[in-house]
Amino acid sequence: MKIIIATHNPHKTEEIKNFFKGYPVEIYSMADLGIKEDIEETGNTIEENALIKARFLKEKVDGIVIADDTGLFVEHLNGQPGVYSARFAGENATYEDNNKKLLKLLEGVPYEKRKAYFKTVIAVVEREKETLLEGKLEGHILDHPRGKNGFGYDPVFYVDNLEKSLAELTMEEKNKISHRADALMKLKNYILKRLEEK
């Protein structure tokens, strides 16, 4: 089975390939197929963005297309950065820029009011069918970055029951508990079901 991921992000591609190791599934990114176009994420929600990306790519390729979008939702900030998580500090913001802006906005806010959750939505687009799968991880925002692993908001997102930030976890540890892992687990079950149907 051929799955194409609507992303230019090598981290995401690697993560998804790891998840499907040992399964009869071939996974390609847009880069693998030489598709260089940027897909404009014009949706008002992460669900809309995931579907926009998957539908765009499905018009160009055969196979099952998946696209995801992730947002960090901070309670104290009324759900910000949300759909703007990747460009929270501006259009060409780095991970570090986004983290700095978030920490600045939460300066002086006590720990119990720094509740946040990550949500990943995966859109699966096939010939006649569109499916949305969702994963979630709850935690708190730290007052300074911790850890060297991962990417994005991982250094400032604290997983309470592990007493570590996401950036302090190994890829294996993160893959067991993250919002992406939760959504990818649902994707894996979905794909395995599709393999059984063949």
From Swiss-Prot:
E.C. number: 3.6.1.66
Keywords from the UniProt entry: Hydrolase, Magnesium, Metal-binding, Nucleotide metabolism, Nucleotide-binding
Residue ranges of coiled coil: none
Catalytic residues (positions): 69
Binding locations of substrate: 7-12, 70, 151-154, 174, 179-180
Xref: InterPro entries: dITP/XTP_pyrophosphatase, ITPase-like_fam, RdgB/HAM1
Organism: Thermoanaerobacter pseudethanolicus (strain ATCC 33223 / 39E)
GO MF term list: dITP diphosphatase activity; ITP diphosphatase activity; metal ion binding; nucleotide binding; ribonucleoside triphosphate phosphatase activity; XTP diphosphatase activity
GO biological process, alphabetically ordered: nucleotide metabolic process; purine nucleoside triphosphate catabolic process
UniProt superkingdom: Bacteria
Biological function: Pyrophosphatase that catalyzes the hydrolysis of nucleoside triphosphates to their monophosphate derivatives, with a high preference for the non-canonical purine nucleotides XTP (xanthosine triphosphate), dITP (deoxyinosine triphosphate) and ITP. Seems to function as a house-cleaning enzyme that removes non-canonical purine nucleotides from the nucleotide pool, thus preventing their incorporation into DNA/RNA and avoiding chromosomal lesions.
Similarity annotation: Belongs to the HAM1 NTPase family.
PANTHER family: INOSINE TRIPHOSPHATE PYROPHOSPHATASE, INOSINE TRIPHOSPHATE PYROPHOSPHATASE/HAM1 PROTEIN
GO cellular component, one term: cytosol
Cofactor note as given: Binds 1 Mg(2+) ion per subunit.
Protein name, per record: dITP/XTP pyrophosphatase
